[in-house]
């Protein structure tokens, strides 16, 4: 994430989050979601949608239809969201975390396909990094992904370990 938003753009994004929260996230709703242990999928989709709040656009590189935000911007957005509701902040951060391996290590075709869909469609991602023996300690993971090649081109990965 080499890019960063300029200060004005970041401030507008943070203000937009505050305005959305004031309008759409009353304390009573946040308490209800917490008490019912409910994932508010439709609300998260609205927050991700370019037509509403477009939080995910901040994380997507310019060339795929996003705003090209950097690590500092991710931190500030998540910090602001967490001040409103940790569950919603985690939900929004999940797409960033889930798409980061594609952004960093995916092929150009994969980046174009999936990063563009986050920007255009508000597609949500998830990130899984646990194993029975490791929990969420990434350093203790034992799963290995071995490339599977056909005609000299990697077409998939064979994954070992227990998930």
Language-model segments: residues:
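Short, well-ordered alpha-helical packing segments
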Residues: 78, 82, 99-103, 115, ...
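Alpha-helix boundary/interfacial micro-motifs
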Residues: 71, 78-79, 87, 102, ...
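Amphipathic, small/basic residue-rich leader segments at the start of a protein or domain
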Residues: 1-92, 112-113, 117-120, 153
